[in-house]
Amino acid sequence: MGTKKPFRIKKTSDFQRVFAKHKSFANRYFVVYSDTQPKEVDVSHWRIGLSVSKKIGKAHERVWVKRRISESFNNISLFIPNNLDIVIVARPLVKGQKQKIIQDQLMHVLDLAGILNGKEKN
């Protein structure tokens, strides 16, 4: 099951705000950007934005990757602190990988960023 609407970042301005902080962590499969939510955002939970470029492949391949990332994120969402906006950028290597590898690599990059343990790195 995918990420529900209140848990998604949809506005371009929200994506740009997270990218502007220049807090990024990466591995071979993903680049993760994170930022605390601004006061205007009236949610008390994390939000996720996914970016899957045309370098990944055709539309059906990009949707496949988005679904796998979303499912993996939902499986580990209990470990994500509230009031955090996270943007995940998929790299081309993620295409065609098994769900287990995608989830493990997503956990790895979120751990590098200090997001999983609730101590976000600067």
UniProtKB/Swiss-Prot annotation:
**Any GO CC annotation of this UniProt entry:** ribonuclease P complex
UniProt keyword annotation of Chaperone present: no
Please verify whether the record's keywords include RNA-binding: yes
Q: Which InterPro entries match?
A: Ribosomal_Su5_D2-typ_SF, Ribsml_uS5_D2-typ_fold_subgr, RNase_P
In Gene Ontology terms, what is a biological process of this protein? tRNA 5'-leader removal
> What does the record give as the reaction this protein catalyses?
Endonucleolytic cleavage of RNA, removing 5'-extranucleotides from tRNA precursor
Q: Which UniProt keywords apply?
A: Endonuclease, Hydrolase, Nuclease, RNA-binding, tRNA processing
User: EC?
Assistant: 3.1.26.5
Q: What is the purpose of this protein?
A: RNaseP catalyzes the removal of the 5'-leader sequence from pre-tRNA to produce the mature 5'-terminus. It can also cleave other RNA substrates such as 4.5S RNA. The protein component plays an auxiliary but essential role in vivo by binding to the 5'-leader sequence and broadening the substrate specificity of the ribozyme.
The UniProt family comment states: Belongs to the RnpA family.
Assembly and partners?
A: Consists of a catalytic RNA component (M1 or rnpB) and a protein subunit.
The name this protein carries in UniProt is Ribonuclease P protein component
Q: Which organism is it from?
A: Oenococcus oeni (strain ATCC BAA-331 / PSU-1)
Recorded name of the encoding gene: rnpA
